[in-house]
Each structure stands twice: as structure tokens, then as C-alpha cells.
Amino acid sequence: MAKPFLKWAGGKTQLLEEILSRPPESYSRYIEPMVGGGAVFFSLASRNNPPESVINDLNAELINAYRQIKANPNLVIEELQALAQNSETYYHIRDAERSPEFLTWELHKKAARTIYLNKLGFNGLYRVNSSGFFNVPFGKRSGIDFNSTNILAASEALQSCEIMNVSYVDILQHILPGDWVYLDPPYLPINETSNFTQYTAGGFDITDHRALRQFCDTITERGAKFTLSNAHSNQIIELYSNYNISVVFAKRSINKNGARRGAIPEVIIRNF
């Protein structure tokens, strides 16, 4: 069974059972406009008779990794195995994108870089600065297993999947009646210390969440089903008050303060 090949902020591994125990009675395709680490997608894709799928993310680096694992998994694995696991190599690889030569890198090498930085970076964070450059420090780890077996399994799971790199709004034109759309946006922060939205150089604020609610309304009008995950907050509850809301608990592992990692309430919102 394929699993996410990256550790991703907001990843849904801890919520898989809650999400997948609440599917539509029937659906024709599975669409994920904000795929991130892809825990839900990989779980569905690894089942018998997996649904036709479309995954998308605005993060071009992430989508390149998906596309290269789909098309060239062995080349990605070879690149990963050739990289030393130490701070000197880490910072050399991390800062390579600041050089004009980075534009000449082959796409599978860039994909390996993404995975390498994710596995060896501090706490598995993906964070960029205002210029769009990855700026996570070395995590002081070695002996990391890049799990080539899982990369190959992920490649197999992706073979029948369409992979896109556009704004989630642009996915709307591809959504048809009978589709099941799973939305996992950057969560609305529930306090001043929990605002982590740097998946790309831009953030995701309350205005974006209101626009996402309108997106969900359009999905509903189109005759498709949606499931959405978000933080348990009064703003989110009010925003989606006309939909089916379930409160669940998830254990979060990406937090700079280890003492704050643990089970926290979240919501699963559905139009069915």
C-alpha cells in the first residue's frame, strides 16, 4: 500500500479513518484540489478498484515531485541514494535554487531535492521566505531511509491519476456531477501561534476561507459531493453552518514546540 512520500504540514494520516469512514454512497471520480502530502489519495488509490482520480496543488515544487515519481521513480531514487546525509550537503542542496544553474537541473533531480530536504529538514517542515526560497534549517538527522519501496508503490498508485498544478479555483471547470471532491486547505489559525500557511510564498487567510466556502457552494450546485477538513473554530462553524459538520480529533506532529503536539479538535464538513 502506497503512503505519502513526504511529511507535509496538515497531512491527513491521523484523520484517514475519520475521513474515509464518511464517503458518499457512490461517486464517479475522486478529486483533490489541494493534495499536499496525499494521504487520502494514496489510501484510496491503494484499494481494490481505485476510483479515477485528479490531484492538484498550487505548489509547483510539490507537483513536480508527484509527476516525477509517477514517470521516473527509479531516477528519483538514484538521486536520493547518491546524496550524503549531513549538514554541508543539506545546505548545498537547499540553497541550490538561488543559483541560475538550478534552472538547468533535470526535473527528476529537483524532485529528489524536494524529498531530501523534507526528510532531513527540521521537523519535516516545508517553508519558504518572501522570495519563495526554501529556508528550513538542517534537522541534525542522519540515517534517513528514503523508502524506495514506497516511492515505487506511490508511482504505481499515480499511474491512473491526472496531476495538475493550478489554483484550486481552476479545478472547478473539471468537476462534474457525481464527483467526490476532498478539500484540505491551510487551516484557519485558532490562535496566534498556530498560523502556519507557508506552503507557497502566499498565505491563506479568512478572506481565502470565505472564497473557499463559495467554491464549495458551487460544487454543491453542480451536483458533486465534497468533504472538507478544517480547524474547529467558531468562524469555520459559522461559515459552513448550512452543511454537515462533524467534530473529530487528530494528532499533529509538525509543531516547533514539541510539548504542543497532540490530539486537537478539527472538523470534517460535508454536503451529504
Task: Give the predicted meaning of each segment.
Residues 35, 60, 170, 187, ...:
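Short, glycine/acidic-enriched loop or turn micro-motifs at the edges of active sites
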Residues 21, 26-101:
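SAM cofactor-binding core of SAM-dependent methyltransferases
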Residues 178-268:
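Conserved acidic-Pro-Pro-aromatic motif
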